[in-house]
């Protein structure tokens, strides 16, 4: 058991704790800072990012207002690099109390807060998204501050003055005696304990301050108030927006990095870690955003979270609760050797620390004044205010040090490697998120998380099991913050993330027990084995949708002699397909057999199984037996061979991973799978790759590459590589866009065009043209006008919730947008998804879709076919979880075949 000693032990690594450590260290005291998690994982990392001017508190809490405006100026001076000078606007809309404005102005003046009246026109010129219904607008000196950057900046400054930081160390015992304090700290990662002997303890544990005081035998009543916030996926504003009214729910909108954060609520809770969010809070915050920015609630909500405010209970005992509790702070000396600082704001953390350390120095008889407000933090950080575009500017005009790993937040591989080097042991991906904002953008880690896991594994020499477990933990945590917002585009994002992590990576099978095989009954239409008609000459068929189901329906209709017109808003899910076709229980359906025959005829080689990107063991073997070599490229971000090989090896499949350099230097940090596939179409390029790989071969019997081996003629590329290397080669999926999926899309679309079909992608069908109970055509929006195309039969293959065939909103409404067909779904939106993204049972939302009769005709609201000649295929059909059932493509193939058969009749 290690034993440490110091003058001051600071407990709590939030804003107040790190400022206290810095202050005490500057005064010449020996300091240890202990935090039970990572820095700023409590209240300081779960707030809206506002650097307060104090104007919000001017009327109700003038003491806090004065503290905020003074500390606002000090932080700008000593740590400008963690602050974005957004400025602030206080705005009033109709319904806000008019009598509050003069009281607020008077209170701001008394607190020393500059509040400048501007016209509504000027406010909207500065922030065009604001409502034209504004009635008042005032400028104030608000700003945006990054709580994670603040914690790291002050911690590094404290360490420069000799402080020691112990993260993931929880205080489990605290004994305050006449000669000092003895504390027991437990490392939450290793279980090891440390004994710390200190002359004094500063309890800056925020919501946990009462628990820490209780360890020493002292009562401290802290009132916990939970506040919920939502991050929207874009910067609606570049200025902090406050409602000009008494503080209440949802009256602050803060531009933070690439997003906007609206908050907060104020709910009394019973635990310091109660970060739950209730549905009404989401609705209330969106409604309040709509009041100041029209269209706000229709935008994509990205993530919701809550933080717990530690309010000093002395106020609550007098019957004052919630927002009425003052937002200033208290410094409490329980006994010689133990001081607690509680309450306050992140904006006033430096001042809180100053007063706490003043109390310590007074108790120790030390004369050393606070100097933290006198000069900037030490270090080589910029001496200027943070600018949002600084990362992009560095990428565009500086030297690009390696690939861009997180496109949303512009995080490079070099930045991740630098952050990793600062840790004594391998960091969690969530640590890197707090350091770099990794995974905090619109994709919520869908693409960058596995890249970061691969980088951590390689940099720290982690085994594959540990790296994979870290990835799973990060994915689960990202989903937890997005689950309450799963509707619209955000729902589609998490469905995409789920497809990536289940199918392309195989993460669910590596980190959980295999799902039980479910013998689900086939729908009536799937059991019918009648063939498609071969005599539909001249019949006009419109297929809506260009995914697997839509294109295969078009193929079958063309082969039957129909005149086919494919209309689609986009290219469907084919570019997400990992490189194989899951046919599951539909393997003996004639639609699947037709597809496989067609693949053979057109040079498309369906492979019999293969590992997922993370090395999930396949159901069947591929490319023979024996050890395999997994090849990746050193400067390419979308495939990590050591991670794949390590996971294969722990499943009993001998494998070794290597990186080779790309033959030519590629300066672009956005080298996509399709661009790399084009490189492999060049014989000289692949010859050089083969030479590099052959030089690294040992006794491996086969070689696996990322699935980028050519776009034009992958069979030739693979054959030549195999000949040049002297081993069979095979492909392993990469992150989207999928090269195998793109190949299949190109081949299908090209074949249809050569057969005379019309393929119109990029135009949305807006409405049907109906005569009686028949659809005689569809209207398409194109170049500012509507065009009608006529048909004898229509096949609806627009996809499900991901593909856009079904739409959803925050109130739990689901609808089919073209024909207004009823949707089979649960009405409780929170029941659409289970708590874990990769739950092996799947999610109820997977089964949502339209109901059909045995002929695949969609049913209307009365339970009968909506139209005589409308048929459906693919993932718009409800009732089956094809992702968990292992029949994603099989379902598309079988339903497309059946829909065409019913639309055209059969021989």
Describe the predicted segments one by one.
Residues 4-6, 191-200, 784-793, 866:
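Core beta-strand elements of the Rossmann-like FAD/NAD(P) dinucleotide-binding domain
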Residues 11, 196-206, 542-544, 789-799:
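Short hydrophobic core segments
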Residues 25-45, 558-576:
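Glycine-rich FAD pyrophosphate-binding loop
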Residues 49-126, 493, 579-636, 641-648:
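Dinucleotide-binding Rossmann-like beta1-alpha1 core, especially the glycine-rich loop
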Residues 85-90, 124-161, 182, 265-272, ...:
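Helix-loop-beta segment of a Rossmann-like dinucleotide-binding subdomain
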Residues 138-199, 645-649, 687-697, 710-767:
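Helical element adjacent to the flavin cofactor pocket in flavoenzyme catalytic cores
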Residues 147, 221-228, 234-236, 240, ...:
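C-terminal catalytic lobe of FAD-dependent flavoproteins
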Residues 203-217, 796-812:
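Flavin (primarily FAD) binding-site architecture
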């Amino acid at each position: 058991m290690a034993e440490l000693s110091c003058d001051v032990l600071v407990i709590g690594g939030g804003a107040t704790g790190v400022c206290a450590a810095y202050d005490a260290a500057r005064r010449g005291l020996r300091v240890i800072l202990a935090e039970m998690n990572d820095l700023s994982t409590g209240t300081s990392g779960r707030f809206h990012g506002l650097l307060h001017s104090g104007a919000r508190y001017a009327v109700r809490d003038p003491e806090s207002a004065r503290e905020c405006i003074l500390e606002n100026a000090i932080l700008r001076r000593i740590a400008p690099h963690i602050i974005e000078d957004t400025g602030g606007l206080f705005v009033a809309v109709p319904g806000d109390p008019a009598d509050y404005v003069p009281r607020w102005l008077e209170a701001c003046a008394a607190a020393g807060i500059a509040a400048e009246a501007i016209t509504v026109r000027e406010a909207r010129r500065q922030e065009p998204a604001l409502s034209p219904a504004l009635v008042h607008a005032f400028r104030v000196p608000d700003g945006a501050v990054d709580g994670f950057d603040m914690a790291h900046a002050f911690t590094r400054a404290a360490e420069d003055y000799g402080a020691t930081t112990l993260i993931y160390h929880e205080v489990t015992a605290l004994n305050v005696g006449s000669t000092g304090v003895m504390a027991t700290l437990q490392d939450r990662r290793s279980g090891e304990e440390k004994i710390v002997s200190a002359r004094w303890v500063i309890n800056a544990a925020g919501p946990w301050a009462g628990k820490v005081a209780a360890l020493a035998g002292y009562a401290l009543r802290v009132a916990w108030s939970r506040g919920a916030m939502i991050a929207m996926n874009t910067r609606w504003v570049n200025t902090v927006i406050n409602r000009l009214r008494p503080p209440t729910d949802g009256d602050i909108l803060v531009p933070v990095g690439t997003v906007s954060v609206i908050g907060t609520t104020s709910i009394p809770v019973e635990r310091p870690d109660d970060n739950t969010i209730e549905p009404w809070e989401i609705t209330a915050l969106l409604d309040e955003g709509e009041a100041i920015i029209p269209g706000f609630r229709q935008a994509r909500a990205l993530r919701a979270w809550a933080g717990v405010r530690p309010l000093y209970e002395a106020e609550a005992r007098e019957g004052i609760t919630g927002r009425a509790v003052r937002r200033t702070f208290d410094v409490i000396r329980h006994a010689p050797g133990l001081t607690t600082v509680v309450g306050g704001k992140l904006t006033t953390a430096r001042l809180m620390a100053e007063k706490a350390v003043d109390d310590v120095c007074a108790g120790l008889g030390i004369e050393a004044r606070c100097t933290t407000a006198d000069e900037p933090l030490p270090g080589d950080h910029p001496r200027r205010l943070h600018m949002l575009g600084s990362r992009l500017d560095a990428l565009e005009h500086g030297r690009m040090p390696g690939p861009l790993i997180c496109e949303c937040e512009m995080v490079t591989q070099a930045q991740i490697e630098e952050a990793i080097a600062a840790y004594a042991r391998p960091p969690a991906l969530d640590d890197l998120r707090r350091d770099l904002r990794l995974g905090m953008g619109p994709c919520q880690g869908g693409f960058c998380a596995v890249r970061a896991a691969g980088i951590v594994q390689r940099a720290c020499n982690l085994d594959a099991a540990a790296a994979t477990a870290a990835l799973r933990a990060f994915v689960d945590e990202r989903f937890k913050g997005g689950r309450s917002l799963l509707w619209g585009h955000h729902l589609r994002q998490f469905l995409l993330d789920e497809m990536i992590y289940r199918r392309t990576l195989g993460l669910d099978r590596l980190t959980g027990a295999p799902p039980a095989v479910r013998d689900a009954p086939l729908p009536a239409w799937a059991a019918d084995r009648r063939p498609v008609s071969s005599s539909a000459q001249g019949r006009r068929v419109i297929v809506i949708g260009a995914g697997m189901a839509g294109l295969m329906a078009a193929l079958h209709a063309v082969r039957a002699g129909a005149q086919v017109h494919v209309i689609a808003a986009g290219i469907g899910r084919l570019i997400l397909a990992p490189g194989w076709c899951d046919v599951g229980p539909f393997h003996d359906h004639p639609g699947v057999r037709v597809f496989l025959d067609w693949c053979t005829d057109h040079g498309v080689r369906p492979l019999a199984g293969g590992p997922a990107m993370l090395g999930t063991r396949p159901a069947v073997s591929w490319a023979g037996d024996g050890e395999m070599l997994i090849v990746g490229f050193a400067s390419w971000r979308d495939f990590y061979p050591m991670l794949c090989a390590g996971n294969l090896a722990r499943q009993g499949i001998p494998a070794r991973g290597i990186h080779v350099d790309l033959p030519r230097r590629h300066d672009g940090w956005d080298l996509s799978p399709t661009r790399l596939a084009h490189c492999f179409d060049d014989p000289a390029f692949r010859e050089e790759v083969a030479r590099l790989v052959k030089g690294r071969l040992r006794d491996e019997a086969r070689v696996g590459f990322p699935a980028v081996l050519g776009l034009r003629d992958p069979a030739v590329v693979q054959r030549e590589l195999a000949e040049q290397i002297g081993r069979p080669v095979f492909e392993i999926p990469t992150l989207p866009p999928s090269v195998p999926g793109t190949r299949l899309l190109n081949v299908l679309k090209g074949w249809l065009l050569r057969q005379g079909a019309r393929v119109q992608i990029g135009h949305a069908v807006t409405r049907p043209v109906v005569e009686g109970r028949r659809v005689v055509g569809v209207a398409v929006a194109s170049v500012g006008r509507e065009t009608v195309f006529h048909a004898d039969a229509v096949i609806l293959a627009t996809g499900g919730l991901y593909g856009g065939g079904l739409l959803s909103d925050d109130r739990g409404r689901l609808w089919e947008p073209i024909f207004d067909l009823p949707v089979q779904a649960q009405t409780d939106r929170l029941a659409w998804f289970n708590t874990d993204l990769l739950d092996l049972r799947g999610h109820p939302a997977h089964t949502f879709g339209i109901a059909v009769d045995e002929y695949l005709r969609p049913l209307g609201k009365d339970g009968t076919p909506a139209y005589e000649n409308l048929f459906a295929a693919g993932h718009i059909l409800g009732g089956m979880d094809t992702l968990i059932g292992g029949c994603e493509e099989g379902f598309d193939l079988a339903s497309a075949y059946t829909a065409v058969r019913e639309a055209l009749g059969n021989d």
